[in-house]
Structure formats: C-alpha cells, structure tokens
C-alpha cells in the first residue's frame, strides 16, 4: 500500500485533498489512492487494505467483523460528540513499523510520553470493548475467534514461519495456505 493516510480533520478536508490531487494530475480518481484505509465516496464505504493479506475465509470473516464493529463504535463516538484521543502522526507511523517488524509481539507507543503497551494486549482489550457492539451486530463469535487467535498465537504469519522452520521450503508455505483456504 501507499501507507497511512494523511491526518484530515473531517470529510470536507478529504474531499478538498482529493480535488487537489486530481487538479494537479496526481490521480484521475480515488481508485489510484492506495492508503491502508480510505473512504470510497462512490460506494459509501471504508476500504481496509489489510484484508488482502488474510489467508483463510474464516479469518477474513473474523477480520471483517472486527472492522464492522470498529466502524460502528467510531460512528457512535462521533454521534455522541465524543472526542477520541489522537496520537501524533509520527507515533502512529512508528507503531505501524513496530507491528510490521515485530508482529503481534510488538510493544506499541500509547501516548506522547513514550509509554508502551503490548500490541497483543491492546488488540485483546479493543476487541473486548467491542463485544457489546458485536452482540448487536450478531458477530460476537467472530470477535471471540480473533481473541483466541491472538491469545493462542495462531496468527497467519506465525504459521508461515513455523512451516518454513519445519520444512525449509517456501513451496510448503504455499501448500499450507492452499490447504487452509480449502477448509
């Protein structure tokens, strides 16, 4: 992807940003913007690129449920007039790098004083806070599946690494994913 989107205060700023890119001939349409997450005005949706890397249908459904619950939760905050704490862009970028480098075992920065928290714990905490929303959306099982994956270290990239450590053959990783997708 092209990484994280710029910090924009509201949808009007997003629209202005897109118009500027188009007028400057940087893009022809929103489809040429490949951020990790972006709104798609034509569909009225939010696109999240991480789903492209999920190897099984079940895991993709679990992740889609999480994204749906996050969207509803954030929308509820907006409707209530609540302000979310927003980290500085450099902290968000650093946390993305840490997650990319260290995976689920990363420690992420949670404030501007440099306090750290485990990514694993943060994920579980967020999912647990979303369980009431998941109950309403009838996707609580999917969120519980994600908690189990995180707590049991059953993460796709770790399965890849374990397969390679066992066989020393990249073809076996492809076979693993083909077999998982068939389930």
Model region roles, listed by residue range:
Residues 1-183:
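C-terminal accessory/tail domains of diverse enzymes
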């Amino acid at each position: 992807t092209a990484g994280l989107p710029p910090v924009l205060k509201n949808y009007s700023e997003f629209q202005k940003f897109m118009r500027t890119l188009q007028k400057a001939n940087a893009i022809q349409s929103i489809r040429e913007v490949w951020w990790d997450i972006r709104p798609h005005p034509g569909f009225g949706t939010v696109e999240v690129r991480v789903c492209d890397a999920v190897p099984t249908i079940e895991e993709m459904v679990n992740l889609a449920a999480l994204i749906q619950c996050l969207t509803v939760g954030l929308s509820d905050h907006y409707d209530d007039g609540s302000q979310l704490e927003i980290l500085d862009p450099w902290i968000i970028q650093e946390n993305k790098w840490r997650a990319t480098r260290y995976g689920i075992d990363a420690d992420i920065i949670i404030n501007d004083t440099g306090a750290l928290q485990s990514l694993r714990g943060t994920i579980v905490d967020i999912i647990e806070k979303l369980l009431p929303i998941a109950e309403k959306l009838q996707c609580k099982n999917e969120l519980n599946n994600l908690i189990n994956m995180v707590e049991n270290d059953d993460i796709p990239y770790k399965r890849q690494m374990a397969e390679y450590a066992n066989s020393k053959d990249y073809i076996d990783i492809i076979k693993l994913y083909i077999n998982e997708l068939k389930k």
